[in-house]
Amino acid sequence: KSPMDKEYFFNQYDENIRPYEVIKEIDGNTAKLKLKEPKYYSITISPSQYELKHIHNNPEKLRAFVREAMKEYASSFNREIGGRPIIVNDIKYFAKIEHERTFKSNDVAVRENKPYSKQIAHLKNELRKVERGEILGNTRQIENDIRKLIRDAPYKIRGQLIEPGMKKEGLQSHIHIIVSRKDASNTYSLSPGSKYIASEVEMHGKWVKRGFERDRFFQNSEKAFDRMFQYNRNYVESYSARKMLSKDPKQYFLSLRNLGIHEKKIAFKMIRNTGLQLPVLHLPQNKVGFAVKQLKKMIEAGIKSSSIGY
């Protein structure tokens, strides 16, 4: 394997942390957790290919960004420890850079190829039976039918149908982060999945802060990347745009139309790179909704700049 394939874990201050050390640290940091409570949370940071290209896919820059993002993670807790806000030193985490991704069964390309894959598998099985003399059939015709199905399938890489397990092309570096449920002192339980938004509640006669501000974490992490690497983020790459696309597609498209000429050109190029032609203007009204839904689906699948998931 190349050195890039031999990435170890790192945290805020240390590097080259071995997997067994990570397991030991996480397993040993679970004081007073109930049996059904998770020992840790998983976060994935997935810079887009545009962002990776901008930083030349540099692992050092990715590590630097993760460390900055984890500062934002800590400050997004609406909690206090010893009367002070939570800081990154209170968070026990371990991160690892991965450089490859494979297609999964729930990826758009795999799902939309599935009907073709099924027919091809059936025909290949039939072809083998004909070749073994188990059934009568025209092998040349079956082979032609297989080639046609491959040709007609919507998603391919170098002529091959995209299927689960196939490696994705292009820059695919992403970071997996394991964050202990308990703080670094093994005293306080910290959950980014808290159902409570940032608020205060009275407990045992005292007002206690609680909650985790997800929007703040996403937006500030995005700003940190842009600030650190002088990245000029396009509207369609922004967290606020992705959120608007999910909640109010009509407003999202209005915002796209109102972009400056240069930014709009780049935005539409990014959208086209997700694999869908933009809907033409002046579509009959009954087709507009369909086009918007299809475009929305493809943008969500294809544009995940600095996406951070749990």
Per-segment meaning from a language model:
Residues 1-310:
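N-terminal nicking endonuclease/strand-transfer module with a His-rich metal-binding environment
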